[in-house]
Amino acid sequence: ISTTALTHGNSQKKDKDNKKSISEKTKEEVKNIQDYYIRDSEIAWLQDKWIYDILQPLIREANDKAGWHYDLETAEQIQFTVYKPGGLYGWHSDGQQDIANAYRRYFEGISIEKKINGELPPKFVKQNHLIGQVRKISMTCNLSLPNEYTGGNLKFDFGPHHMGERYHEVKEIRPQGSVVVFPSWLPHCVTPIETGVRYSLVLWSLGRPLR
């Protein structure tokens, strides 16, 4: 899929359960995935222009048609993700949209509690173009065929005050090549893979913090 990629595993387990792999657990044991694992997947980072050229227009279209009208300035590297049997991603949001979060990911020693007042801390990192930016829109693109895996659905939590259903599993994107675009603050998870392997692309569009 890509001419250049940096690959590594991404498995984060809570201390209380670090002796048992997710594949060894029963469905009952993983029914509350946040109690056991934050994430269990393999990822690679892609920077191919032709992939951006396909995905970014879809994000801009969704930003307009959904009425979000976020000011977008740049994008992160594209994440290629592999979820194998037992793989999952617990409940999370892709980023908060405040000024502290815009800086703390990119500098050593910066925490959400530290006041920044718009000034850059002294230690820079390689991702200079991302400094001061926050994730505003997230996109997931399914690369697998529907019959190649079971489980592994993207699931949203719209909150207790949502007029409709609070939780929704996005089975609409199971057809290969389907995409879903959503605000990065929206809580979501990937349910455990039961059989097969799920491949996906994830892209985040960024802009200045909301005021």
Q: What role is predicted for each listed range?
A:
Residues 1-181, 185-211:
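Fe(II)/2-oxoglutarate oxygenase catalytic core
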